[in-house]
Amino acid sequence: MEESLKPMDAEQLRENAHKMVDFIADYYKSIESFPVLSQVKPGYLRDLLPDSAPDHPESLEDVLEDIRQKIVPGVTHWQSPNYFAYYPSNSSVAGFLGEMISAGFNIVGFNWIASPAATELEVIVLDWLAKMLNLPNQFLSSGQGGGVIQGTASEANLVVLLAARDKFLNRFGKRSLEKLVVYASDQTHAAMKKACQIAGIYPENFRVLNADHTSNYALVPEALSDAISNDLSAGLIPFFLCATVGTTSSAAVDPLSELGKISKVNDMWFHVDAAYAGSACICPEYRHYIDGIEEAASFNMNAHKWFLTNFDCSLLWIKDRSALIQSLSTYPEYLKNKASQENSVVDFKDWQIPLGRRFRSLKLWMVLRLYGLENLQSYIRNHIKLAGQFEQLVCSDSRFEVVVPRTFSLVCFRLLPPPNHQDNGYKLNHSLLDAVNSSGKIFVSHTVLSGKYVIRFAVGAPLTEEEHIKQAWKVFQDQATILLAGSDGSDFGASNGDII
């Protein structure tokens, strides 16, 4: 007769966890040996795994070997020091240890009573971060506001939009939904458009305002004022503005002070999305980029991007938590308890879309305690310095140009097209990106700014050092030389750049 399954045996955990930590540590020691961008073809894994799950147990050694041989080749290595695509997704020893503890407890902290420590630690740690960022006191839990950990900035944007929507519907009536107008620039993350779709905002009432090179792709206050005036004249209700500190395409910074004043005059909900660049604002020399946050109703940043905290961990602060709670709260009988009914505790289920939630504050707490503010500031500054060095390398080669001035650790640049080039270098840079990524030596991503195909070089991986910056630049130079030598610049193909 088979032994009964003991899925959480302490000694088995001890033995296997040691093996798993060794496996992960070995992965990090050898991470530079892998192509940064996975080189597999779509559907590669289907032929490598059985058609059905096993009937009987297999050994951990066999599973780990399959990970080495079958899974790792299909991994794009976000933690590689040669990863420069999108924006970073940081990991660290502290963050990893926090994830381990969270997985060990495996609580589902939807309300206070479900695990008091999970709720209370989150409140405390978000207050710590608010003070590190020098946010106004209204964002602290001691007043009417407070902070909460969401999964992603997309969730943060959605919940504050829902809170704002319901606040205005309560004021103007449920039938006024068709009149509510949302404002953002064309550089705002696409998550805002999705949030509007989910919130039922009429598509024609999502104002996407043009931001171009004349403002370094920041939202122009005059454009916002004009759009609001036109909508008011048409009998519509301007109610929500999303500004960005560190846009996805170019790390542009919207002018918060001026936008905040416009929002205040028009009694709008002003939200600031600093998913990427918010982390830099713990450094005094970068704090001015969120000057004007005083007028914001809500603010978010992703600790999992550039703050050494493993994914997922998006931080959201709000000045009036009652707006979130009124929009998102539910009180089924099976969740009622004395502490909640007496309003003596925070129930974070009412600050988010799902009911269940992980103990995410543990890893953030571990990062803050094991590294401290000074080390975190140095970490940010080093990446910005490395990006500055890469920018100088670009400027030193007359074949390239920096497309927008660098603000943080993102460099936007392109290879200049030969004279009389038909598409202004679009295909040329498309091909350069494809060649660089196909080499497996580095991974970068792209955007399009004012019709120009632009390569984004985002410094932020925890293991990246100066040598990796220099090596990456050599890859660009070598591939550019090959491209320019092989054609007159009039026709460049790109086999798979559209999906990179």
Curated annotation (Swiss-Prot):
Among its keywords, does the record have Cytoplasm? Answer: no
Q: In which tissues is it expressed?
A: Mostly expressed in bulbs, and, to a lower extent, in stems, roots, leaves and flowers.
What reaction is this protein's catalytic activity? L-tyrosine + H(+) = tyramine + CO2
Is Hydrolase found in the keyword set?
Answer: no
Q: Which InterPro entries match?
A: Aromatic_deC (IPR010977), PyrdxlP-dep_de-COase (IPR002129), PyrdxlP-dep_Trfase (IPR015424), PyrdxlP-dep_Trfase_major (IPR015421), PyrdxlP-dep_Trfase_small (IPR015422), Pyridoxal-P_BS (IPR021115)
Q: So what EC number does this one have?
A: 4.1.1.25
Cofactor(s) required for function per UniProt: pyridoxal 5'-phosphate
Q: Which residues does the annotation say bind substrate?
A: 89, 189
Residues recorded as bearing N6-(pyridoxal phosphate)lysine in the entry? 305
The UniProt entry's GO CC annotations, sorted and at most eight, read: cytoplasm
- Listed transmembrane segments: none
Q: What class of enzyme is it?
A: lyase
- Repeats (sequence): which ranges? 65-122, 125-176
Keyword line: Alkaloid metabolism, Decarboxylase, Lyase, Pyridoxal phosphate, Repeat
> Mind listing the GO biological process terms from this record?
alkaloid metabolic process; amino acid metabolic process; carboxylic acid metabolic process
Q: Which SUPFAM superfamilies match?
A: PLP-dependent transferases (SSF53383)
Q: Where is this region: 2 X approximate tandem repeats?
A: 65-176
Q: In which pathway does it act?
A: Alkaloid biosynthesis
Any GO MF annotation of the entry: pyridoxal phosphate binding
Task: Report the CDD domains cross-referenced here.
Answer: DOPA_deC_like
Binding residues for pyridoxal 5'-phosphate, per the UniProt record? 153-154, 248, 302
Domain of life, per the record? Eukaryota
Signal peptide positions on this chain: none
Family named by the database record: Belongs to the group II decarboxylase family.
The protein's job, in short, is: Catalyzes the decarboxylation of L-tyrosine to tyramine, which is converted to norbelladine, a precursor to all Amaryllidaceae alkaloids such as galanthamine, lycorine and haemanthamine, and including haemanthamine- and crinamine-type alkaloids, promising anticancer agents.
Name the record gives this protein: Tyrosine decarboxylase 2
Q: Which organism is it from?
A: Narcissus pseudonarcissus
